[in-house]
Curated annotation (Swiss-Prot):
SUPFAM superfamilies: Anticodon-binding domain of a subclass of class I aminoacyl-tRNA synthetases, Nucleotidylyl transferase, ValRS/IleRS/LeuRS editing domain. Monomer. One of its GO terms (cellular component) is cytosol. PROSITE patterns: AA_TRNA_LIGASE_I. Catalyzes the attachment of isoleucine to tRNA(Ile). As IleRS can inadvertently accommodate and process structurally similar amino acids such as valine, to avoid such errors it has two additional distinct tRNA(Ile)-dependent editing activities. One activity is designated as 'pretransfer' editing and involves the hydrolysis of activated Val-AMP. The other activity is designated 'posttransfer' editing and involves deacylation of mischarged Val-tRNA(Ile). It catalyses: tRNA(Ile) + L-isoleucine + ATP = L-isoleucyl-tRNA(Ile) + AMP + diphosphate. It comes from Hydrogenobaculum sp. (strain Y04AAS1). ATP binds at K627. This is Isoleucine--tRNA ligase. Zn(2+) binds at C915, C918, C930, C933. Its cofactor is Zn(2+). InterPro entries: aa-tRNA-synth_I_CS, aa-tRNA-synth_Ia, Anticodon_Ile_BEm, Ile-tRNA-ligase, Ile-tRNA-ligase_type1, Ile-tRNA_ligase, M/V/L/I-tRNA-synth_anticd-bd, Rossmann-like_a/b/a_fold. The keyword Nucleotide-binding applies.
């Protein structure tokens, strides 16, 4: 007789082969409008806000974008299954130099000169370019399975956004932290603009360092000779520099009051420098003195008719250079700080292209600063002032956009003063949108002080992020927020034509903001309209009474653009702080810091409760991905071959706080892991075709093995959910794979097959197992949904035939922890599982010895000890099923001792006949089958 039709073999339409690249497209169509439905469903629940750090609207998305957006999506979806009303509004950074450069490139191809084009027309082209890539990237992000308010993203070029930035400038001015100053800033001579600290990256650079002597004036020589017994030769101080091109801007020399300086004799002159300098190694010291005795001595510039003085400075360290640092306040921040102290105005004879101006010596005028290095060195050599030159490799700032070296250059710029006390700048506030109430909480603290204080109120993931941010805040200079470009939000300040006084009244900023937000052109109106059209009627200079004004031509730093997003995106909707900001670890000095500083400057508090950072993507060997190396992998190519869910699984497969490896072999391994997860879901569905949720048996009434798995899985699910909530996604992944592969596939599912297949539909034995299978399926699907979103939604569609009245989408469900436990049973099974390991090992040995071919052919004899005797007696009727053998006997035997339990275990040939239906060996048959099968046909 053929018993096949009497066996409950698995049945499901849930395919074994995922075919994700096609199936996901179907699911994406179903998700249209889902975000809006979720917001409606969760209305009134506690709000959870992840504020999106805006990617740049240029080019297609790369693997770093995918990592970033998927991590954000996982966080949001975890909040969804936790029961929150999740607010995620994607954004784009739309202004800035890269877009300008791309538009310029397109214009050049058409032989159109940008300079001949009206600024508002050029800005229109930039806007169109950004819009194009917003649309492209939006579709690519959607393909990753990211849920969000994609119909209403925020764009930094949106008129309302730009208008709010104008208000933020007003708040910063009102709070006394925004000022205009002539001071050195990072300057890219190729892009011809100032750059913020966050826009430079340090790279190794070869340069020529030089030792140069500066001759002391006779009067200063005499001062030294009165203190020291010196030969009658000219005295020179020695400076060491790696930037010879800054020598034309030299206005002084810094020394240290605490360093010991020495005099050495060389050729026809005496040299004065610090005792530890490499230059005086193995030279005889004629005399020595402390640095404080050098203050005020004067020297002659080596090639300019200019004298300078020696000034004490905390920036001079022993052991580096010569103990004397040449000071060019127009080309160095430390130089500027010391110069300011002693009344030295910044001097920079270099234009925006990095070429020396008419203020420089004739022999270098018109030269690029880097070209001038060799010319200056040669000049010093010929005039006898060069003592030594050598090549060095040092860390030097480069423009993060064009990758060229930048310089420090003093120019008039707008700054946010990080050490300025935040107090109301105005006697009164004329507009409710620019108020002073937030400032009261600051108690006259500076931005730096308040920012440092706020870092302790923020949760940092990983924790090292806090120290990184603190280090940057403690050492950063004032924030230069002005740029000399076209495509950005203008700094909306007017100057009196007659006396140059700026208009700083708050109502003027509000007036301009309203013009921007009421126009489809937004900030372009600044370039379209003249001053009278932009100013309130009858505006008068309070200083001189003039009615004629001129507009500021600089635009805002793009970091101010994105850093003020909290004010443009969150606060108008009543959200003072986002729950999470998440970006790459480079954003500590970028968006995180810009957001923190801008928020404190305007509102006196951090805009975020938590900051999560991720590492960067590298290839399988740990190398940085680059086109030149040929190791770049496109996320879109991965999706095409494997599907987005494999990419999403990759994101949690390693510790994302470190750099994450990606390559073909890694993707293949992940595809295998995905199959294990999918087969787990399929096993559950396949064995639930005749089950309904209402058939479920109460946990405490289940078969003891099912009861064990229910209690054990409840703990595992809580563990997994805890990993989610603590952002420990790689731990979630490894525990998930362990649970799926070992606890379910190798144990529970393996043991369960016999009971599921052989017992009647509707029987207690089958229903008990099915109750747990559905419990596993539902909880696994919900817990998988933040990561394997497409697969979870696909699985969920099959669950609707099992449980009535399920919500439309898996994401409309909440994870609810089970409070069921049975500690005694869990302890019993801990021991039984150890015994199972020993039994399976013994069976495998006998299979290799050809004693048995299949576990069902085995009879296992176990000799119990005192610890195991009661346990084996308690479960003796179930042990054969648990070990997947035909028979188990508790008796004396001469078998080998088990590794885990130390019990003697012997495997023999099972007694009796093989049941043709269940394949178990039994000693009694009824109507040609075993007694159990005879009752289940």
């Amino acid at each position: 007789m053929d018993y096949k039709d009497t066996i409950n073999l698995p049945k499901t339409d849930f395919p074994m082969k995922a075919n994700l690249s096609e199936k996901e497209l179907e699911i994406l169509k179903k998700w249209e409008g889902l975000y809006e439905k979720l917001r409606a469903q969760r209305k009134g629940k506690q709000l959870f806000v992840l504020h999106d750090g805006p990617p740049y609207a240029n080019g297609n998305i790369h693997i770093g974008h995918a990592l970033n957006k998927i991590l954000k999506d996982i966080i949001c979806k975890v909040a969804l299954i936790e029961g929150f009303d999740v607010d995620y509004k994607p954004g784009w950074d739309c202004h800035g130099l890269p877009i300008e450069q791309q538009v310029e490139k397109e214009l050049k191809a058409k032989k159109i000169n940008k300079e001949s084009m009206p600024k508002d027309e050029f800005r229109r082209l930039c806007r169109e370019y950004a819009s194009k890539f917003v649309s492209i990237q939006k579709e690519e992000f959607l393909r990753l399975g990211v849920l969000g308010d994609w119909e209403n993203p925020y764009l930094t070029m949106d008129p309302k956004y730009e208008a709010q930035e104008v208000r933020e400038i007003g708040r910063c001015l009102q709070n006394g932290v925004l000022y205009k100053g002539n001071k050195p800033v990072y300057w890219c001579i190729y892009d011809k603009t100032a750059e913020a600290e966050a826009e430079v990256e340090y790279k190794e650079k070869k340069d020529i360092s030089i030792y140069v002597r500066f001759e002391l004036l006779k009067q200063s020589e005499n001062v030294l000779r009165q203190k020291l017994d010196l030969p009658d030769k000219p005295i020179s101080i020695v400076i060491w520099t790696t930037t010879p091109w800054t020598l034309p801007a030299n206005l002084g020399v810094m020394s240290s009051e605490d360093i010991e300086y020495v005099v050495v004799e060389e050729d026809n002159y005496l040299l004065l420098l610090e005792k530890q300098s490499q230059y005086v190694k193995n030279k005889e010291f004629i005399a020595s003195l402390k640095g404080k005795e050098l203050t005020g001595l004067e020297y002659q510039h080596p090639f300019i008719e200019r004298t300078g003085k020696i000034y004490p400075s905390e920036f001079v360290e022993a052991g580096t250079g010569t103990g004397f640092v040449h000071m060019a306040p127009g080309h160095g921040m430390e130089d500027y700080i010391v110069g300011l102290r002693y009344g030295l105005e910044p001097f920079s004879p270099v234009d925006e292209s990095g070429r020396f101006t008419e203020e420089a010596p004739e022999f270098i005028r018109g030269l690029n600063v880097f070209e001038a290095n060799t010319v200056i060195i040669e000049h010093l050599k010929q005039t006898g002032f060069l003592l030594k030159e050598e090549e060095i490799l040092h860390s030097y700032p480069h423009c993060w956009r064009c990758k060229n070296p930048v310089i420090y250059r003093a120019t008039p710029q707008w700054f946010i003063g990080v050490d300025r006390a935040i107090t109301s700048h105005f006697a009164s506030c004329e507009d409710e949108k620019i108020d002073t109430s937030d400032v009261k909480k600051l108690q006259n603290k500076s931005i730096r002080e308040k920012a440092i204080e706020e870092t302790y109120n923020v949760k940092w993931v990983p924790k090292t992020g806090q120290n990184r941010m603190l280090s940057m805040l403690q050492n950063r200079p004032d924030w230069c927020i002005s740029r000399q470009r076209f495509w950005g939000v203008p700094i909306t300040i007017f100057y009196c034509k007659r006396c140059g006084e700026p208009l700083l009244e708050s109502h003027i900023f509000e007036h301009v903001a309203k013009i921007f937000e009421s126009s489809p052109y937004g900030a372009d109106e600044w370039f379209k309209k003249d001053e009278k059209e932009l100013l309130p009627p009858d505006t008068v200079c309070k200083k001189c009474g003039s009615k004629d004004f001129v507009k500021e031509t600089d635009i805002l730093d793009v970091w101010f653009d994105s850093g003020s997003s909290h004010a443009s995106v969150l606060r108008p909707r009543g959200i003072e702080k986002a729950d999470v900001y998440l970006e790459g670890s480079d954003q500590h000095r970028g968006w995180f810091q810009a957001s923190l500083l801008e928020s404190i400057a305007s509102y006196g508090e951090a805009p975020f409760k938590s900051v999560v950072t991720h590492g960067f993507t590298v290839d399988e060997k740990g190398h940085k991905m680059s086109k030149s190396q040929g190791n770049v992998i496109s996320p879109l190519e991965i999706i095409k071959e494997y599907g987005a869910d494999i990419l999403r699984l990759w994101v949690i497969s390693e510790d994302y706080t470190e750099d994450i490896k990606l390559g073909k072999s890694i993707l293949k391994r992940l595809a295998e892991d995905y199959k294990k997860i999918r087969n787990t879901l399929r096993y559950c569905l396949g064995n639930l075709y005749d089950f309904k949720y209402e058939f479920s048996i109460a946990p405490d009434k289940l078969h003891h093995f099912d009861r064990y798995m229910y209690a054990y899985a409840s703990k595992v699910f809580e563990e997994l959910f805890s990993f989610y909530k603590n952002y420990q996604y790689h731990r979630f992944y490894h525990r998930l794979m362990e649970f799926v592969s070992i606890d379910l596939s190798a144990l529970y599912f393996d043991v369960l097959k016999d009971r599921l297949y052989m017992y009647k539909s509707g029987s207690f034995e089958r229903l008990s197992a099915q109750t747990v299978l559905y419990f596993l399926l539902k909880n696994l699907t919900i817990l998988l949904s933040p990561v394997l979103s497409f697969t979870a939604e696909e699985t969920y569609s099959y669950m609707k035939s099992i449980e009535n009245h399920l919500p439309e989408s898996i994401f409309m469900n909440e994870y609810k922890a089970s409070d069921f436990t049975d500690e005694e049973l869990l302890k019993d099974y801990q021991k039984l599982l150890l015994l199972r390991k020993d039994v399976l090992k013994a069976i495998e040995i006998e299979r290799k010895n050809d004693i048995i071919k299949h576990p069902y052919e085995a009879r296992v004899v176990i000799k119990p000890n005192e610890e195991f005797y009661k346990l084996l007696e308690k479960y003796k009727d179930y042990l054969h099923s648990f070990f997947t053998v035909s028979q188990v006997e508790i008796a004396e035997n001469d078998g080998e001792e088990g590794e885990y339990t130390k019990l003697r275990i012997k495997v023999e040939k099972a007694k009796g006949e093989k049941c043709p239906r269940c394949w178990l060996y039994v000693e009694t048959m009824i109507n040609g089958v075993c007694p159990r099968c005879s009752q289940n046909i």
